[in-house]
Swiss-Prot record:
Assigned keywords, A-Z: Blood coagulation cascade activating toxin, Calcium, Disulfide bond, Glycoprotein, Hemostasis impairing toxin, Metal-binding, Secreted, Toxin
Domain C-type lectin intervals: 10-11
Assembly behavior: Heterotrimer; disulfide-linked. The heterotrimer consists of 1 heavy chain (a metalloproteinase) and 2 light chains: LC1 and LC2.
Protein family according to the UniProt entry: Belongs to the snaclec family.
Gene that this sequence comes from: LC2
Job description of the protein: Regulatory subunit of the blood coagulation factor X-activating enzyme. Activates coagulation factor X (F10) in a calcium-dependent manner by cleaving the Arg-Ile bond at position 234. Weakly hydrolyzes insulin B chain, fibrinogen and some components of the extracellular matrix in vitro, but does not activate prothrombin or plasminogen.
Note: Calcium is required for ligand binding.
Organism expressing this protein natively: Vipera ammodytes ammodytes (Western sand viper)
PTM per Swiss-Prot/TrEMBL: N-glycosylated.
Protein name: Snaclec factor X-activator 1 light chain 2
Record's GO cellular component terms: extracellular region
GO terms, molecular function: metal ion binding; toxin activity
Compartment(s) where it occurs, according to its Swiss-Prot or TrEMBL record: Secreted
Tissue localization of expression: Expressed by the venom gland.
Length: 11
């Protein structure tokens, strides 16, 4: 399962 981009820190 992959977390959505908003879940993690962005660049």
């Amino acid at each position: 399962l992959f977390d959505p981009p908003d879940s993690x820190p962005x660049y």
